[in-house]
UniProtKB/Swiss-Prot annotation:
The keyword Kinase does not apply. One of its GO terms (biological process) is mismatch repair. This is DNA mismatch repair protein MutL. Keywords: DNA damage, DNA repair. This protein is involved in the repair of mismatches in DNA. It is required for dam-dependent methyl-directed DNA mismatch repair. May act as a 'molecular matchmaker', a protein that promotes the formation of a stable complex between two or more DNA-binding proteins in an ATP-dependent manner without itself being part of a final effector complex. Pfam families: DNA_mis_repair (PF01119), HATPase_c_3 (PF13589), MutL_C (PF08676). InterPro entries: DNA_mismatch_repair_MutL, DNA_mismatch_S5_2-like, HATPase_C_sf, MutL/Mlh/PMS, MutL/Mlh/Pms-like, MutL_C, MutL_C_dimsub, MutL_C_regsub.
Length: 610
């Protein structure tokens, strides 16, 4: 039998390697920016078109390359960073494997221009699919310019797996911010489709953090510093009140290399224990300096995971450093931070008409089999129980309805008729400022005021987004919001839908918007927090749930603008919630799947006393 094992051609081997190194446009951005930093650049420019699918270009003023090095850098495992295996444990540069340029050139059309200081002419190389098309001398300033065009042009399957431009831009933005944060001594600029997104000069770390992450951190940064013989910690943490419900602005850098570490993240979270809610995440920007001999950076294709030879010691030092910084700045434990906006969404006692909406409002993520003790109602045509105020109530039912009945999880659904629900002199009151209790003929209805209001608002906002309307209340004094670049890009992307909800705002700068109005049913006084909360909730939902953008926006705004447990309600407000809930298409469940209402029938209540 003849031999069947063959050596792969270089171009195929490079494409296989590119599968690990070049996963999306952001991977190319990361590699090129890090190469520019390694070259000693003091000014780096990133130019992107079509979210990197059409063009990624990085221009720097680093030391450049000779003609021979320029050609050799496109060969696999060609690097200037290491000479022996021992060098792997003394690495302080970003690159060292010699795979990036060969991998990129195998799946894109690449042009490089580079020149050493003192040389009259530089080198021009054009390469496609690992094949060199042009190699000649050219005029060029000191430094290097690399253009990567039509990424995955020769691998259609890979290109088809790329996400939308907004998603790919978010990943590019993340990579840019990480490199720029790690090197405040370098000036960076970033352009997308000829629009300048960033232009940050050489500056201090605190100023760089504010420039990249948003002005909201200007007054929130707490210095964090610890020196030991084993490791040094420096950087900033955020005040507890700046903690958010989403993980995003948390950065670890080991010897200036961005890493991910759930273990070290836990050290920071432990230090913030009892200062922030358990579901909130603090800001931190921490730099760990350690002898390269004590770490291994060669354990992950993207080098974002590393191994410490004594991880427990690093954990303990980080935890102690953060705790000491919090104590030094007199941050005392507190358990009353409220990250949700308390606003009222009452628009009057009339019922909202949801019959004309074409929307997926029957969102019920909790699934039960027929054997479950609690089953969801299939009825979507709930009619209001009451109309008007307590002395003018008139039930308007066109058909029977189904109501969840759940006492200790033992009751199945019960069908209640108009006669069963009707009772004279109905009494309604609030229980522990959390539940609305109202009497019906067959027993008592318990309504979760927050869950019910979220359902009401969710269906209302879905209608606004799909029917393109939304009334606003204008501000006498507009409010300015400074956002991170990623949040700003997200707001611009969703601008049309956000306006449909009733928000009125203008773009002031690359990271600043001016809010002139909010939805008309939002209680005044919390406008800035509401907009910021909407963004945070949207990001949290995007991470945790697989839902489309409009549903996410509607759920996010409903979550942030619904009344909260602990809010005292008037009788009018309680009746309004009940009326509007029964007018919803899916009144049984809040958008997150939690029950909005349960019924305690008299038979079950009676048996509790036997």
């Amino acid at each position: 039998m003849s031999d069947i094992i063959r050596l792969l051609p270089d171009n195929i081997a490079n494409q296989i390697a590119a599968g690990e190194v070049v996963q999306r446009p952001a991977s190319v951005v990361k590699e090129l920016l890090e190469n520019s930093v390694d070259a000693g650049s003091t000014n780096i420019q990133l130019i992107v078109k079509d979210a990197g699918k059409q063009l990624i270009q990085v221009i720097d003023n680093g030391k450049g390359m000779s003609d021979g090095d320029a050609r050799l850098c496109f060969e696999r495992h060609a690097t200037s960073k290491i000479r022996s295996a021992d060098d792997l444990f003394a690495i302080r540069t970003f690159g060292f494997r010699g795979e990036a340029m060969a991998s990129i050139a195998s799946v894109a059309q690449v042009e490089m221009k580079t020149k050493l200081p003192g040389n009259e002419l530089g080198t021009l190389i054009r390469i496609e699919g690992s094949a060199i098309l042009v190699h000649e001398q050219t005029a060029h300033p000191q430094g290097t310019s690399i253009s990567v065009k039509n990424l995955f042009y020769n691998v259609p399957a890979r290109r088809n797996f790329l996400k939308s431009n907004s998603v790919e831009m978010r990943h590019i933005m993340d990579e840019f911010v990480r490199v720029a944060l790690a090197h405040p001594e370098v000036a960076f600029s970033f352009y997308h489709n000829d629009l300048e997104l960033f232009n940050v000069p050489e500056e201090t770390l605190s100023k760089r953090a504010v420039s990249l992450l948003g002005g909201s951190y200007r007054e929130q940064l707490i210095p964090c510093k610890e020196e030991t013989d084993f490791v040094s910690i420096s950087g900033y943490i955020g005040k507890p009140e700046s903690a958010r419900k989403t993980r995003g602005d948390q950065y670890f850098f080991v010897n200036n290399r961005y890493i991910r570490s759930n273990y070290l993240h836990h050290a920071v979270m432990h230090a913030f224990e009892e200062l922030i809610p358990t579901d909130a995440f603090p800001f931190y920007l921490l730099f760990i300096e350690i002898d390269p001999a004590h770490i291994d950076v060669n354990v992950h294709p993207t080098k974002t995971e590393i191994k410490f030879d004594d991880e427990k010691t690093v954990y303990a030092i980080i935890k102690a450093c953060v705790k000491r910084s919090l104590g030094t700045h007199n941050i005392m434990p507190s358990l009353d931070f409220d990250f949700n906006v308390n606003v009222s969404g009452f628009t009057g006692m009339g019922l909202s008409d949801s019959s004309g909406r074409e929307s997926n409002t029957n969102f019920t993520p909790k699934s039960f089999s027929t054997s479950d003790s609690i089953q969801r109602s299939n009825q979507s045509n709930w009619e209001r129980m009451y109309s008007g105020l307590e002395n003018n109530r008139e039930e308007v039912y066109q058909e029977s309805i189904k109501m969840v009945s759940a006492i200790n999880g033992t009751e199945d659904l019960k069908q209640l008729s108009k006669e069963q629900l009707y009772t004279e002199n109905t009494s309604t009151f609030q229980l522990h400022q959390k539940y609305i209790v109202t009497q019906v003929k067959s027993g008592v209805l318990l309504v979760d005021q927050q869950a019910a209001h979220e359902r009401i608002l969710f269906e209302k906002y879905i209608g606004m987004l799909q029917n393109r309307f939304g009334s606003s209340q204008q501000f006498l004094f507009p409010q300015t919001l400074e956002l991170s670049a990623a949040d700003f890009a997200m707001v611009v992307e969703m601008e049309e839908d956000i306006r449909k909800l009733g928000f009125v705002f203008n773009v002031f700068s690359n990271t600043t918007i001016v809010v002139n109005g909010v939805p008309s049913d939002v209680k005044s006084g919390n406008e800035k927090n509401l907009f910021e909360g909407l963004i945070e909730q949207f990001k949290q939902n995007r991470t945790d749930l697989k839902i489309d953008r409009q549903e996410n926006l509607a759920r996010s705004l409903a979550k942030r603008s619904a009344i909260r447990a602990g809010n005292k309600l008037s009788l009018m407000e309680m009746n309004s919630i009940i009326d509007q809930l029964f007018a919803c298409k899916s009144p049984n469940y809040a958008p997150d799947g939690n029950l909005t209402v349960v019924m305690l029938d008299m038979d079950k209540i009676g048996r509790l006393f036997m």
